[in-house]
């Protein structure tokens, strides 16, 4: 590989690396970026093998950076998917207590959701659980109508495509391992 100089390098081409590359290119459109992925394709590991759930902040401590970023990021993710025609479905989610001993944990999760401003979140009973999800049994539950699923591989690929479209000097290298990083002290 010939020697190239880039302003910013991102290592890893999963959803986090792809989103970082995309956001950096958006923030610094004249900078020459590189994304380096050791696998033959982007989103090869966790990103390409997860359930695709769009998280809405149920499990994060209210007021924490994780909760704040989750709330902000979910809206940005859904808007990005709509704008770029990426498969997604806001199908809702049921969180279930299968025994009375789990109800106190369910109440904590509900409280987190309310404090994290999750739209439409509500407590549901066993009959309502069956109505929404006939194959699920529970004694108590939470309905989160704004949760959904998304094609995270499609998101990662589209973020890279949009970033490269912003600056064609930026590059993505797959099947490339990072073995050493040196910082030029003069810059």
Predicted regions and their residues:
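Conserved Rossmann-like nucleotide-cofactor binding loop
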Residues: 16, 20, 41
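Glycine-rich FAD pyrophosphate-binding loop
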Residues: 25-49
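Helical element adjacent to the flavin cofactor pocket in flavoenzyme catalytic cores
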Residues: 142-187
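Gly/Ala-rich phosphate-binding loop of Rossmann-like dinucleotide-binding domains
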Residues: 21, 25, 162
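Dinucleotide-binding Rossmann-like beta1-alpha1 core, especially the glycine-rich loop
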Residues: 52-132, 138
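Beta1/beta-strand and adjacent pyrophosphate-binding region of the FAD-binding site
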Residues: 2-16, 34
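Short loop/edge segments at beta-strand edges and connector loops
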Residues: 37, 90, 124-126, 174-176, ...
